[in-house]
């Protein structure tokens, strides 16, 4: 579950774009303007939500040439938080994220395609020692000058990953085989 969340987190970072004249952005996690969230069904009765609190990443963005855009994200899996200490401890164990052996999850984009108002960001997500392709559907939320003399761009992305694809085989029941990723990032343009 946490592993899938990491995958989504990486995916969210992928939703940024770039080109030959693309601007490079650093994800603004220090200003609390970036979130890597996930949700998974609990026994088919409700949604269990979580987040990764410690991650870093960059992206390039060029509206005129999205196919050249790049996204790179690293998530510290130990930072998983579902607002329940015992569950978080279990998610960090070898049954799920195995943070002792695999302390980081990474996402590196391999392609970005514009589909209407959205971007399909495909990349390699490495989670729990397994690397698989993941596609995120992303949308530009806005871009422009900030009040401090800089430039920013913000994206929201969603995607799904299957736990078993990342060697997370704990049986959580038929309703809990996929993790939904919900990523929201704001990047600060680098000079």
Swiss-Prot record:
SUPFAM superfamilies: YceI-like. One of its GO terms (cellular component) is periplasmic space. InterPro entries: Lipid/polyisoprenoid-bd_YceI (IPR007372), TTHA0802/YceI-like_sf (IPR036761), UPF0312/YceI (IPR023480). It holds the Pfam family YceI. It is found in: Periplasm. Residues 1-22 form the signal peptide. Keywords: Periplasm, Signal. Belongs to the UPF0312 family. Type 1 subfamily. This is Protein YceI. The lineage of its organism: Bacteria, Pseudomonadati, Pseudomonadota, Gammaproteobacteria, Enterobacterales.
């Amino acid at each position: 579950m946490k592993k899938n969340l990491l995958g989504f987190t990486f995916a969210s970072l992928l939703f940024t774009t770039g080109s030959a004249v693309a601007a490079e952005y650093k994800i603004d996690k220090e200003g609390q303007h970036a979130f890597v969230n996930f949700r998974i069904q609990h026994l088919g009765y409700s949604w269990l939500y979580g987040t990764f609190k410690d991650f870093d990443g960059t992206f390039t963005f060029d509206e005129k040439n999205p196919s050249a855009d790049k996204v790179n994200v690293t998530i510290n899996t130990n930072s998983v938080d579902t607002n329940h200490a015992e569950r978080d401890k279990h998610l960090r164990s070898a049954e799920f994220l195995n943070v002792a052996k695999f302390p980081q999850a990474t996402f590196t984009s391999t392609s970005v395609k514009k589909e209407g108002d959205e971007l399909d960001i495909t990349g390699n997500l490495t989670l729990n020692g397994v690397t698989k392709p993941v596609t995120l559907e992303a949308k530009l939320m806005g871009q422009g000058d900030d009040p401090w003399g800089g430039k920013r761009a913000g994206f929201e992305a969603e995607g799904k990953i299957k736990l078993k694809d990342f060697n997370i085989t704990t049986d959580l029941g038929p309703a809990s085989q996929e993790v939904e990723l919900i990523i929201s990032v704001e990047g600060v343009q680098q000079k």
